[in-house]
Amino acid sequence: MKLSKTRTALGFSTGVCSVGAIITLMLANFGGEIHTSKQGLEIIGDAEGCRRDPYQCPADVLTVGIGSTAASGEKIDPKHRYSDLEIAERWKNDIVIAEQCVNKYGNGKQLPQSVFDAAVSITFNVGCGAVRNSTLFKQLRSGNYYQACHEYRKWVYAGGKKLPGLVSRREKEKALCLADLTSH
């Protein structure tokens, strides 16, 4: 009886997991493998949420953890309840894929940290194919960071509809993007 109460208190018997706990676990175990800051991870994690049990997202894609899909090459077992460590490792792999896109198509290695973090967040959300030839990434490649930061507000539509959740996420990404720039 005591064990089940402890497990419930720690979130093990529920399908929801703590984004903060996953970030802490990911940075402790895999921090050397990613360049995205804790602040960048918080924006992504808070926007995505965290679920232990696989589910079909609104786009009808099997998803688990913090927005993790099979797009990273790792299959999702729809009947498996994922542990915090499994979620942290999957998310690290997904973040690395988004970072590789930002590095390759957005001149990521030259970007200020906050600009890089915001670019990783939008890439994680919409995918590399959607952003790599975008005006946002063209501005990043040209070193026009301030202009790039103002591109985020254009990325608020899904299925032709303006979504409040995307408006909120893009405002947070824009603010993060501008954080390390001296002249706003």
Identify the residue ranges that each predicted region occupies.
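Early exported N-terminus immediately downstream of N-terminal targeting peptides
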Residues: A59-A70
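Long, amphipathic alpha-helical surface segments
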Residues: M1-Q56, S68, K75, Y82-N93, ...
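Short alpha-helical scaffolding segments that buttress acidic/His motifs in well-ordered protein cores
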Residues: I44, V115-T123, E151-R153
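Extracytoplasmic
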Residues: Q39, A59-V61, S114
